[in-house]
Amino acid sequence: MGAMVIVGYRPKPGCEDGLLALTREHVPILRRLGLATERPALAMRSKDGVIVEVFEWRDGAIEKAHQHPEVMAMWGRYAEVCDYVPLSELSETKDLFAQFDPIDL
């Protein structure tokens, strides 16, 4: 069985377009490499501009990803355009029904 993950990306100043482009190609690359399932990925934006992504890793793929040069390079590009944000820092997570603005992938 895979693992569902939810991750927050805070765009660095002037980097939101680059972050959105990278997020749109993220899961398709992981799928091509056999690391993510075909379950539809979701992306959304918090009130303060954090991009939230939800997708499913294949069983055992998280460990494999940390050793794959293409994934490591992609994560390096993420580091150039964003900072990772714990979900607990998003004000929406304090609401019973957290609401976000949808982003088309």
Describe the predicted segments one by one.
Residues R10-L22:
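Short, surface-exposed ligand-recognition loops at beta-strand->loop->(often short) alpha-helix junctions
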